């Protein structure tokens, strides 16, 4: 949930688009998320009649990228539970209630990577600990590098990628109304991250 996943973009870039020694050495270091161009979107089936969508915002996070040993790179990302937006205030209020998150100001969703496996020139699997609603579970993200290189305006290393995973609400004690409202939640992530100054 990384820009949860920028490490994938960097790792992928190191094996593909950023393959030269000079470029990969320049790519090593700490990166931060571009919150203005990063989204986590989720969707679930509602009684078989429709698909409901929502998203989270307010990302904070840091990626430490090791160009010589990409598997040793790390990702730490967080986002406020109460940043959830679904387009209907009453639904958001219900999700924040004790029926689901029981959310209070300051509650966060966090992701900390535990392993990165490069699977192709522009694909990777990122495994990490996802903590949500006082429950921590291991999840794996399927990530694809969109682009890696110098940002034309910022003039420093930048990368963007998409990632997907599927979560079970019940794994995080959020399973009310399942299976009528699907337990499975599809998660779609689109991220940009920039090298820290």
Residue ranges and their predicted role:
Residues 1-20:
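Gram-negative bacterial Sec-dependent N-terminal signal peptides
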């Amino acid at each position: 949930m990384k820009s949860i996943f920028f490490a994938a973009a960097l790792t992928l870039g190191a094996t593909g688009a950023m393959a030269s020694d000079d470029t990969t050495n320049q790519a090593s270091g700490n990166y931060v998320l571009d919150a203005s161009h990063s989204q986590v979107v989720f969707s679930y089936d509602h009684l078989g009649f429709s698909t409901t969508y929502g998203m989270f915002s307010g990302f904070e996070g840091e990626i430490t990228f090791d160009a010589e040993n990409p598997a040793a790179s790390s990702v730490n990302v967080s986002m406020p539970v109460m940043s959830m937006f679904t387009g209907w205030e009453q639904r958001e209020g219900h999700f924040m209630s004790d029926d689901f998150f029981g959310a209070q100001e300051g509650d966060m969703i966090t992701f900390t990577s535990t392993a990165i496996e490069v699977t192709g020139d522009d694909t990777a699997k990122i495994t990490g600990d996802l903590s949500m609603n006082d429950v921590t579970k291991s999840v794996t993200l399927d990530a694809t590098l969109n682009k890696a290189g110098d940002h034309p305006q910022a003039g420093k290393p930048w990368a963007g990628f998409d990632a997907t995973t599927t979560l079970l609400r019940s794994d995080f004690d959020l399973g009310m109304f399942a299976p009528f409202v699907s337990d499975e939640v599809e998660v779609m992530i689109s991220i940009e991250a920039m090298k820290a100054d």
